Structures are given as structure tokens and as C-alpha cells.
Amino acid sequence: MQLLVAWTVLRTFAALGRLEPVDEAREGIKVDAAPAAIVETHWPETGIRTRPWSPSKRIATMAKGTRLLVRGVVASRDNSGCKGKPWYAVYPFGYICSEHVKPGREQPLVGHALGERMRGERRLPYDYAKVREEGALMYRGVDGVRTGVAARSLSEGMNLAVARTLEVDGSAYVETVDGQLVSKSSVGWLGQGSAWHGVFLTDNAAIGPAFAWSSRDKVPVLAEPAVKAAQVGTLGLRERVDLLEETGEADPDRWWKIGEGRYVQAKNLNEVVFTAIPEGALRDNRLASGDDQWIDVDLGEQVLVAYRGARPVYATLVSSGKGSPTPKGNYPIWAKVASMTMANQDYEDNPYMVEHVPWVMLFQGHNALHGAYWHDQFGKRRSHGCVNLAPLDARWLFEWVAPALPAGWTGYLPADLERSVVVHVRDSSLPPDQAFFQERPIGPPDPEEEKRRQEEADERRAEAAAAAAEAVPAAAAAG
């Protein structure tokens, strides 16, 4: 069993190692024999860097207690990166400061990030609760409760990841995963999220419409493609149907034949349409090497299809941006994060917060593919700009997209986006010349753009405050 575990770990790490190659001889990195074969992280979050010095890019993060295989030790070049202490060269890639780890004895865990939390029939890695009281207070631990000093107040509708419930001086509280306390009476439990999930695709599929899910409950099925035709049945919510023959050119006159003498208006369906590999979604070198994953998101149909080369392998429903539309374009995934708290930016006026959103893949600025535990409206636009997935879909996609994060790892930030899986975002509901174009730049949020938006928000708020101040004496004089 020990040998099997070690072999599985090495196979996983070998696949990861190809992603971040370093020419150590050319860069003068001398790796000597290490005093330890395995190290264990002992900080709440520890980073792996591209080079054994500072500054160098952080490319991976892991939780406390994560074990790593060591391939050697590198003497420190400076005092700032690791306080003059040596670095460990670790598998599958990169270097970690020796101050951040301790010698370990057991092999690294086998499995996926967050996998240790997914026991039994769980669909989510944490228990979640929704704040149902405007102004509910959040405290930094038991001491905060007893001193009465709140860390912040919460808005109704914010979502918390809960570690446990406890009593403090006779009052019940929930303790969040991050160690904050909120009165239990101020929250309501959210359960395990939607049970919805997509489908695996095993057959060689032709390009074009394949099947669909009904977009609501009790969708009428008619005997002919006409609104006044006799009704011969109904479809339940998200019922899957084959798309056999299309009539009409535009809604509401577009219909699909789904069986003999059975027709449904296209506007009542989320259509799954397979497409050829779009330009820019998959580079030739990746296709030739077998690193051929890419993801198609159709905003018009609210459908996601995962591909390997020209072959679709999985399809499901999503919820994309509503008030803030999801940007169209080709976007390489710039970060994979096992879970992260999402909240409004300082320049946004409407506060929101959802703690420990699971299985996050950031593809453009703040926009991400991620699990959504707070709603069950997949197939409809709903988000702030991200692409929401049901929990089961989010986990599958996160583990499928290379690289798969090993157990204990909390994040991966590729040094070179050329190797990242591309998310191709289009909108089939728009005319062809508007359905796809590169709407935003690739990669993480642009600091200059963030600064500009913050300055605009500060100016807007200052003007509003000045107007409110002027209104007070005017109202008093009128009274």
C-alpha cells in the first residue's frame, strides 16, 4: 500500500511538473542533497515560488499540514526572501522557504484539493448559512463577543461558511471557517446546494444542435409548431430532450421537433450546440501534446460544454452575469483556487459577501467559473459577472481542468498563461458579428483599471455626500 501511495503521488506530481519548467543550470540554481525527503507546511498558508529568491512569482499555495516531496536544498541568495535560510526544491515544481516547513515522516496525501471534506453524500465542502438580519454583528472570536467589540456589521443576504456552533455565556453563535462569531439567531442554514448536475458525453458528436434542457417547469409540448396547436404533453424543469428538427428562423417563431408529433418553442429550451474549435481557444502546440482541454460558455443558452480537442466530454447549465454581463472572449484560466471568499470591490456601492466559494477558476479579472451554493437557478442569468455552476458540476470541472490540485493545495497561479486552459465565452443569442469578440484583456485585474474605478467611486461618493449636506440646511429652512 505504501508503494502504491508513493507511486500515485509521483505520477500526479510528474503531470504537474511539466507546467512550470525551470532551466536550473542556466539560471545558476544549484540543488544539493536535502536533509529531509518530506517536509510539512506549518503556516496557515504557505506559498511555492518559481525561483529560490525574492522577488519571484508565487505559483502555488497550500494549507497548514500539507506534505511535500523534497528533491534538494538551495542556499539562500538574499536575506529578504527567506531571511538568509535555505530553500527546498520540491516536487512537482518550485521552491519553498525552509522557515515555512518542518521535516515530515508520512507521504503526501493522495486525492484532490478539498477532497478530504467531501465525505458521504456531501455536495459541498463546508456548511453554509445566510445572514437574515440587516446589521448582524461579526466578532473576532469569543473575546470579541465578551468585550462587545464587533469586527464588522453584516448585510442581509451575505453568506457564511460555518465550522461549528457554540455557546458563549449562554448565547448561541456560529463560528465561521475563518474563526469569526455571529449570533446564531441572525442566520439561516442553506443546506447542501442544488442537486443539479450535467451529463457526460461519450459518443462522437457532430457539430451543431444536439439536445436541450427545458428552461422551466410545465413547458407545453404541442402537436405542431404553432402556438394554437393541440397540447400533447409538458416538460418538467431541466428535462432533457433531443433536438431533431428546427423550424422558423427567430423567436418566438422558432420551434424544435423533439419527437414524432411533439414540438416545443425554442425560447423554452436551453440548447446544447456543439461547435468546432474556435480560433484562439486551443493552440496547435497544446493540441499536438494532448494538452487539449478547453471550455465553451454560451451566454445565450446558459450552457457550458467542456471539450478535449474537437470532442465534447461534458455539458451542463450555468448562471452567468445579469446586471454585470460576463465578458465575451477567449480567456486562459489565470488562477485555480480551492475556495475563496468573494465580496464587492471597494468601488462597488452594493455590498455582498459569499464566504469560501468552492472550486474557483478565475479566467478574466474578478470573473470566475465557480460553485454556487446559494441558488438553484442554473440555466438563467443571475450572477455579478462570474459563471455560476451547481456544486457537483463545479467540483467535476475543477478536478478535470489541468492541473488537478493535490490534497492540501489551496491554489495554483500559472507563471505562463500560454499553458492554461482557455474559457471561450460567446453569446449565441446575438447577431453573428456581435456574438463573439475579445471584450476584455486576459489575466488578473489590471491595477490601473482598478485604481481608476476606485477614484471614480470616491468622486461619486464625495459628490453625493456634498449634495446630502447641502440638503440638510435647505430642509431646515423650509421647515
Question: Predicted segments — roles?
Answer:
Residues 44-53, 136-145, 217-226:
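Short, structured beta-strand/loop micro-motifs enriched in basic residues and often containing a Trp
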Residues 59-104, 150-188, 233-270:
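SH3/SH3-like beta-barrel superfamily modules
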Residues 16-39, 82-134, 143-145, 175-216, ...:
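Boundary regions of SH3-family modules and the immediately adjacent low-complexity/disordered segments
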